[in-house]
Amino acid sequence: MSDLFHVSSSPHVRAKDSTDRIMLYVIIALLPASLFGIYNFGFRALFIILLTIASCVASEWVFEYIVKKKSTITDLSAVVTGLLLALNLPVALPWWEAVLGGVFAIIIVKCMFGGLGQNFMNPALGGRCFLLIAFAADMTNFNVTRNGVDVYSGATPLALIKNEGLSSVNVRDMLIGNTAGTIGETSVIAILIGAIIMILLGVIDLKIPASYIITFAVFMFLFGAQQFDINYVVAELCGGGLMLGAFFMATDYVTSPITPMGKIIFGICCGILTGVFRCFGANAEGVSFAIILSNCLVPIIEKVSIPRAFGMVKEAKKNE
């Protein structure tokens, strides 16, 4: 009888989606943006993607080997970090800087804080911001030459809007991806296809990206360089890393709130900060720093947004 009633320790109810399965879903969802980036920028984009992924996976394996910790590279989280970081890099970036960004993202941002589930900021964004600070010139070099011919030369659409106005860009090209930019941010259509895949697979819900995008749109409509201009707002939405950040980085399970209201507040914070950086900052972008700063606010957001337990009454009422 004792064998009949012997049970293992909890948990007894398990979801079908493990970490590696979720990470695989994210990789699949990033394929449209990755493939378009390779098509748009050539095989050097593929080289940067593979190199950055290899850098992240190798960094995680080496760190865990040194500290005698069980290897976690099979959960694919390092692959996702490497892929996201690569999609946030300009294709002309020197290869060793891409490697350095991957090492920083994994060892400093992720492993030094205890590994997956313990990091306070998105590792890919941490790696990108490190490279932006350390190698600003290379991270803002979007000149692309193929077979001696300039494919893309000059500023990104956001820089053109900031410096020359809305008439200097074509929103249709921004939707398709025929613009300068990082490997994975140029095609809004490819990013949205990936976002739909993640939504259908249940990887993310729309609370964070929707509140992020709506808040940013309202902010730019009210305070942007061309106030009350819908076309200007659409161009700002399509430019830069907003869509990639809203759907693939702000929704990171580890660094975003878990409560429904917390997710909305977090998205609002991201939207406001991105708007502030774009309107009043020296750089035309702002998504990476906005999400990282919002990551730092997550503990406070969780505290103020946690639902009250059923039956709990406020202290003031208990004393009455």
Language-model-derived ranges and their functions:
Residues 1-22, 280-320:
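Cytosolic-side transmembrane-helix boundaries in multi-pass membrane proteins
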Residues 10, 58-70, 106-118, 193-201, ...:
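C-terminal ends of transmembrane helices
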Residues 25-33, 48-60, 77-82, 86, ...:
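Alpha-helical transmembrane segments in multi-pass membrane proteins
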Residues 118-192:
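Long hydrophobic alpha-helical segments that form multi-pass transmembrane helix bundles
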Residues 120, 124, 234-241, 263, ...:
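Loop-to-transmembrane alpha-helix initiation sites
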Residues 78, 83-151:
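Membrane-interface helix-loop-helix junctions at boundaries between adjacent transmembrane segments
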Residues 42-55, 92-101, 174, 178-188, ...:
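Structural signature of hydrophobic alpha-helical transmembrane segments
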Residues 1-53, 57:
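N-terminal signal-anchor module of multipass membrane proteins
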